[in-house]
Amino acid sequence: MIKLKILLLCFALVGLISCKSSQLKHLLTPETGMFKVEILYPNEEGETFDMEYYEKTHMPLMAGLLGKNLKFYEIDKGIGGRTPNDVVPFVAIGYFYCYDVTEYNKVVGQNIVIILNDLKKFTNIQPVIQISEIKQLKNNDLK
């Protein structure tokens, strides 16, 4: 009887974990019609970038400013170029997935001094920014 209870408890725990995992996956999935703001930090000689500060301080600061308009954000660390011998073109790329681009621009405009002052704390790179509308999401069904 105890073995049966333990087995049922294990099944319940696995079910709970898979539900939470599925919910988290949905939270981190962009949607068609959303906007992706890409902040690219070019890799140039003499430039500095503090990835730890970027991850632990700057991006959470930005997420707080963007509020509910931000669905989620991503951080990429550049590790290579097109070929193994190519220098990495960007040391980092940050992505904000937002529902409303007008609201994004409004928040950034209202907080530009805070954002620029924080930028100086982790890099001397002038970022390149691109805002895109997500037009299509498609899984690769090829196996």
Predicted feature residues:
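Macromolecular interaction modules
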Residues: 19-143
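Bacterial Sec-dependent N-terminal signal peptides
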Residues: 1-27
